[in-house]
Amino acid sequence: MRIGLITSSPDHPVLAATAALLTARGHRVEALDPTAGPDGQAGQAGPDGQAGQAGPDGQTGPFDPPADVYLLKAHTPAALALARRLEERGVPVVNPVAATELCQDRLAMAELARRAGLPFAPTRAAADPAELLAAVEAGGLLLPIVVKSRHSRRHDLVARVDDPARLRALAEEWPDEPVVAQPYLPSTGWDQKLWVVAGQLFCARRRSELAGPEHAELPDGEGGFGPAELSAERAAVALRAGEVFGLDVYGVDLLDGPGEPVVVDVNAFPGIRGQAGAPEALAALALRVGGAESGVPRPRADGTGPGVGSGAATPAPADAGPRTAAG
């Protein structure tokens, strides 16, 4: 089977480990770099350094022929456009483009989550930080709040705002940035990071980037957080998020603490660093979606291949309950 990685960083730990597992089993893994030019041509080499198959014009690309399944790790506009073209050809992409895009719009994410009954933090949108400042000065918005870029991306805005002066500074620094605001809720200074790969849960406690002066004595590094500390309620919230957003590989950020779970973010295909068992789960998912695990090859997008006429691949049996791994 051929598995494609849509990413400009195939050496990312979870991707590299997944690729190693797949190649050890005789599968071919190809990195497709959406930043490398038209159709990611320069990124078609696999971990073994060999180039992808050439098309009629002698160049490599995602459609000559496409791989059996693609893992969509990059979330840039170029990556999403590339993945969408693959989907239009009938090639499965994990996660689907529509689900990935939904998680990049923090307002749309919050609205869908709350409609579905997920305990998502209340979220309001504004054209820019200056609009939030005007709402605070008019008494229509209470501080403290967390201000985030509406559209999630690398190096976007995420800031805790305790007073109007901080909000005024953000308005000057990010004058044209569409934003969302959430109430800043008391916490331990840690975030509970839950990651899910095809229904298998992984978890860790990480220091919150919004930890304030009251958490000055919080030790650096990761906080211990294992399966015994993950309540059934919080595990259920994480699994439900995948159903709501149509995701197979995703992360759910929860506020740490003994109270009711509060979701502050959902991420499509996050890093999942340092989680034993995550590469194995991701490799199994790729094979299942691509059709190899069932023993029934997936028909190619052009309608050819040994799987034509044999029906869909047999789905994996449903789990009796969530599987959990420690961070």
Regions inferred by a protein language model and the residue ranges of each:
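A short beta-strand motif that forms the metal-chelation/ATP-contact edge
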Residues: 67-71, 194-196, 254, 260-274
